[in-house]
Amino acid sequence: MQIQLGANLKPYHTFGIEQLAAQLVVAESIDDLKALYCSAEWASLPKLIIGKGSNMLFTCHYTGMIVVNRLNGIEHQQDDDYHRLHVAGGEDWPSLVSWCVEQGIGGLENLALIPGCAGSAPIQNIGAYGVEFKDVCDYVEYLCLETGTVKRLTMEECQFGYRDSIFKHQLYQKAVVTAVGLKFAKAWQPIIQYGPLKDLSSDCAIHDVYQRVCATRMEKLPDPAVMGNAGSFFKNPVISQQAFARLQIEHPDVVAYPAEQGVKVAAGWLIDQAGLKGHQIGGAKVHPKQALVIVNTGDASAQDVLMLAADIQQRVFNCYGIELEHEVRFIGESEETNLKQWMSEQA
């Protein structure tokens, strides 16, 4: 392993904002991870494991070590009823989805073009167009930082929720995802009840769903390689049935979906209807085609993004009485932070 000192983080996160890390290293094996996390030499140094850096914003320079997960490899097994994949944590997620479609393996096509690595998928329980990671998860393997051993969790043990998992709670900063196990029924059924997939026929093919999802994302979502962004910036808020009924009276065209604990309201709709598409602070801007995305127009600072996010949050609350929660992870100088904490520090 080669450790970079004073590394520029711009190439390592999709917002593409200039920040530095005291140290940065690429891990290509579990032994690399063990050496970094479990040896006395590095024990006291703050560490952050990243994949593609596609769901994070570095709010300032990072004083610890950035560990880039580049564990690679895909193993495929099958029986009469199921395809099973064992995927290393550093595998590129969009490439994995594309590979599955090429192999005729259905189940991931709704999750096409979500930037990131396989190891990040269970942490966030990524989802799109009616499918979440938990729906295809068989197990997750992780390096336990307390024991230095690789452990396996079943899907149920991962405690998946909406953009949530055990890795954000009980195992936060105690685990590094090394691999995921995926399970796909050969009796594939398309999930086409959401958005632009609704007009696909029930007898459509895996490739049809994949192409539609890709076309939709490329039309509505900016390419991070061209315009820096971290995808959906805010979570879709879940509100009670009573609160939704009140909201519907004033806004009968509100976009929402049933959820386990109430109604999930489209955050993009809330931001759009608050008149914030194209709203800009410094080099940070609400994307004119997709209000849920904040983009770096080329010279944005982290403060620009944070100020814009806070402004969006306040305006949406003023309009609808709904507080948006950011989906993007905020990384401070040595640990994860959040918008409320950042705002209190500015006061």
UniProtKB/Swiss-Prot annotation:
GO molecular function terms attached to this record: FAD binding; flavin adenine dinucleotide binding; UDP-N-acetylmuramate dehydrogenase activity
Active site as annotated: R163, S232 (proton donor), E327
Chain coiled-coil ranges: none
Pathway assignment: Cell wall biogenesis; peptidoglycan biosynthesis
UniProt cross-references to PROSITE patterns, sorted A to Z: FAD_PCMH
Gene3D superfamilies: 3.30.465.10, UDP-N-acetylenolpyruvoylglucosamine reductase, C-terminal domain, Uridine Diphospho-n-acetylenolpyruvylglucosamine Reductase, domain 2
Any one Gene Ontology BP term: peptidoglycan biosynthetic process
Reaction(s) this enzyme catalyzes, per UniProt: UDP-N-acetyl-alpha-D-muramate + NADP(+) = UDP-N-acetyl-3-O-(1-carboxyvinyl)-alpha-D-glucosamine + NADPH + H(+)
Subcellular location: Cytoplasm
Top EC class of this enzyme: oxidoreductase
Transmembrane intervals: none
InterPro entries reported in the protein's UniProt record: FAD-bd_PCMH, FAD-bd_PCMH-like_sf, FAD-bd_PCMH_sub1, FAD-bd_PCMH_sub2, MurB, MurB_C, MurB_C_sf, Oxid_FAD_bind_N
GO CC aspect terms: cytosol
EC number: 1.3.1.98
Cofactor: FAD
A Pfam family per the record: MurB_C
Key words, A-Z: Cell cycle, Cell division, Cell shape, Cell wall biogenesis/degradation, Cytoplasm, FAD, Flavoprotein, NADP, Oxidoreductase, Peptidoglycan synthesis
Domain of life of the native organism: Bacteria
Domain FAD-binding PCMH-type stretches: 17-187
Main localization (coarse): cytoplasm
Physiological role: Cell wall formation.
Family: Belongs to the MurB family.
Protein name: UDP-N-acetylenolpyruvoylglucosamine reductase
Lineage: Bacteria, Pseudomonadati, Pseudomonadota, Gammaproteobacteria, Vibrionales
Gene, per the UniProt record: murB
